[in-house]
Amino acid sequence: MDYFNKIIIDIELHHVEGIRECFENGINPNDLFHGSPLIDEMITMYTRTPRFKECIKVFVDYGLKFEDPVLLAVLMDDSEMLDKLILQQPEIVIKRYSLKCTYTPLEDVTLLHICAEYNHDACARVL
């Protein structure tokens, strides 16, 4: 089976177990897809479901290297992690991000905008 093509479909469908299966069969969460990190495909895909944060957690469980722990906390809707990070660096609540999402490009937005885009209300409450 071609697990690399499979994971792209599973990412599009937010198929948590399918993504896990791909990682179990040799796909690395830090691989590139069309020159960008595979996680970017997950973040920028047009699908929006409650399973999104579970998919992100599977990437993390299998060794995702993600440079921005604050953004990662929001993408996972991990309000406890976000709260700890804000206590360490309160200025992060006004940091700006740009994500090239398929339907709604998020250009120069705050973490709260990202919470709204992905319907991550636990982190939105912290912010």
Description of each model-found segment:
Residues 95, 119-120:
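Short helix/loop capping segments that flank catalytic or ligand/cofactor-binding pockets
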Residues 20-28, 54-65, 86-99, 125-126:
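Ankyrin repeat domain, specifically the short helix-to-loop turn at the C-terminus of the second helix
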Residues 18, 51-55, 81, 122-123:
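Conserved ankyrin/ankyrin-like repeat signature
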